[in-house]
Each structure stands twice: as structure tokens, then as C-alpha cells.
């Protein structure tokens, strides 16, 4: 039965935004707010839970610094790596240290909502971190076999981790949601030829893994990724998030023209300008526009899930109100 409106996801607001929302919407916790605004989705990722990876030395997989306080994080440990032997000698994370009890419990306690889960599986970023960004891009040309070997180790960890998690999660989740930011504001970070060689082989394995376990596959990829959306569709991506509206060729009208009916889109409500600076009525008008263009192939959501505190709560409310207006365009069904 066709939906009478697109689904809505608030996203995963920045920690500093929640107090603002609670004050404005008169709520006390995240779930109360999501219930009040009728959010259709819940994202429950293993990496959200402390202790999901219990390495004897206290390390996280592919430990990356998230703030200046994290002084113990390795910085580009493979920056000077030039041989397969060095790759094989590296101390790679072990899936045996993974613990999913907290994630499974949270999934069990989730109500009747669409449940996004699975390891974040950010293999592109992890490989980039291990080499350092500049070295990673250079080594694609100077040492491609080394890049492929490191990619294999990172991806084998995530593939094993997801297999263990999916076997436990079963039907407690609906969509495998994972993220790799392939784009910048203007274009891809790497060219299509390098994308096909270093990204797509393992990317396809992950989408196939998600489908094998009965899940829809939702990819988070910020930036201007228009050039590879056909490849993502061919690889089995069911839904693309977050649709960075101001990035090159990522407006809803262009996406509908080039990919309409072949993939769903989650996001598209601009967080770079519109939600920050526009009036609530202008926000509503743009939500209506995006809904009319993408119709039932849209999940209304911000163009970046981590809503920052510089977005007025009145504009968040306007986005929500327009999302729930029954204005699916019949031309897009």
C-alpha cells in the first residue's frame, strides 16, 4: 500500500543541540522528543555503546582522534608503509573483542519504528586515516598493491563484525546503515577510476552482505557524489543519505531527473544555509518542493544528520511540520 507521506528522520543532532530542542519542545530526553515529533526512524549503532570493543590494551578499532583530548590515538601509523610485508605485520583489530549485548538490548527495546543499525563500516575513512589523507591519495598511484592490502584488512574486520552482529540482530533491525563520505562540496575526493579499483569491490561485498541478511542498505555519503550514484545503485544501495543539497549536482531536481525511481533518498533539507538562515515559512516551502520532486522515494531529513546548535529550533519545527503535510506528488509514484 503506497505511503500517504514520506517518512521523516530528525537525524542525529549534535550533543550541544539537544538542550536547545528540549527547551523549545518541552521534552526531557531524546526518545521523548522523537516521540513528540513523530520521528519514524531510530539509529542504533554498535559503536554508540561504550565497551562494544574490548581490546586488552583499551584500544578502539582503527583508533582515530575525535577531539584534542584524545592524545593516545595513533596518527597515520602506516604513513611510511611501502610493502605488503609491513601491512601483514601491522597489529590489526580482532573481531573476537566485539561485544553487542548493549546494542541488541537497545534494538529489542525499540518501538514500532524503522531501525537503522549495523557497524558504521567507514572503511574508506579508516584506510585514509591509517595512511594519512595525502599519503593515501598518493599511494593509490605509487603503491596501489599496498593500498589494496590495507583496504582488505580493514574491510575483512568490518565484514566479520557485521556477520557476527547480523546473526545476532536478525529481524530486530530493518536497514543496514553505514557511512563513507566520498564527496566534497564540488566533486569526489578520488576519481571514478580509483573509486572503481579501491572502493567498489569491497563496497559491493558489504551491500550484498546486508541484502543476504534481509536488510535494506542505506549509505551515508556526504558531498557531491552524483558521479558515482549509478555505481552505488548497481552495487545494491537502496537509499542514499544525506543528500547534501548545496553540493554540486545534488539538488533534488537533478537527482530526480537522473536517478528517479531507481533509489530512495534520505535527507535533502539544506543545513548549510536554509535551516540556518531562512524563515520558518521558507523552510516549509523548500520541504514541500523537495517532497513534490522526489515523492514517495524520499525520507525527509536534514542534509546533514548532525544538526548543529546554530540552527534555530523554529526552523527545525518548520521542517517537521512540512514533512508531515500530505503532499506526495502523484507524478513521482
How would you describe each model-predicted region?
Residues 1-333:
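Catalytic cores of TIM-barrel enzymes
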Amino acid at each position: 500500500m503506497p505511503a500517504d507521506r514520506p517518512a521523516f528522520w530528525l537525524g542525529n543532532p549534535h550533543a550541544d543541540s539537544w538542550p536547545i530542542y528540549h527547551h523549545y519542545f518541552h521534552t526531557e530526553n531524546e526518545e521523548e522528543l522523537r516521540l513528540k515529533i513523530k520521528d519514524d526512524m531510530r539509529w542504533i549503532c554498535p559503536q554508540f555503546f561504550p565497551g562494544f570493543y574490548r581490546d586488552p590494551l583499551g584500544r578502539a578499532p582503527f583508533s582515530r582522534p575525535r577531539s584534542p583530548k584524545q592524545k593516545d590515538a595513533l596518527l597515520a601509523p602506516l604513513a611510511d608503509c611501502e610493502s605488503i610485508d609491513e601491512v601483514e605485520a601491522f597489529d590489526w583489530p580482532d573481531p573476537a573483542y566485539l561485544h553487542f549485548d548493549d546494542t541488541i538490548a537497545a534494538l529489542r527495546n525499540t518501538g514500532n519504528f524503522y531501525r537503522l543499525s549495523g557497524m558504521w563500516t567507514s572503511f574508506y575513512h579508516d584506510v585514509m586515516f591509517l595512511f594519512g589523507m595525502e599519503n593515501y591519495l598518493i599511494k593509490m598511484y605509487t603503491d596501489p598493491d599496498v593500498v589494496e592490502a590495507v583496504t582488505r584488512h580493514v574491510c575483512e574486520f568490518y565484514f566479520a563484525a557485521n556477520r557476527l552482529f547480523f546473526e545476532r540482530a536478525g529481524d530486530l533491525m530493518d536497514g543496514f546503515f553505514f557511512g563513507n563520505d566520498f564527496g566534497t562540496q564540488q566533486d569526489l575526493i578520488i576519481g571514478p577510476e580509483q573509486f572503481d579499483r579501491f572502493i567498489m569491490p569491497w563496497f559491493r561485498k558489504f551491500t550484498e552482505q546486508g541484502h543476504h541478511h534481509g536488510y535494506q542498505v542505506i549509505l551515508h555519503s556526504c558531498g557531491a557524489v552524483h558521479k558515482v550514484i549509478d555505481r552505488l545503485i548497481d552495487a545494491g544501495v537502496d537509499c542514499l543519505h544525506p543528500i547534501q543539497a548545496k553540493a554540486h549536482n545534488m539538488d533534488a531536481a537533478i537527482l530526480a531527473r537522473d536517478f528517479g525511481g531507481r533509489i530512495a533518498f534520505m535527507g535533502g533539507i539544506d543545513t548549510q544555509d536554509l535551516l540556518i538562515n531562512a524563515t520558518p515559512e521558507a523552510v516549509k516551502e523548500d520541504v514541500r518542493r523537495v517532497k513534490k520532486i522526489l515523492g514517495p522515494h524520499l525520507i525527509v531529513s536534514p542534509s546533514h544528520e548532525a544538526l548543529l546548535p546554530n540552527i534555530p529550533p523554529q526552523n527545525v519545527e518548520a521542517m517537521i511540520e512540512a514533512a508531515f503535510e500530505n503532499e506526495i506528488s502523484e507524478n513521482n509514484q
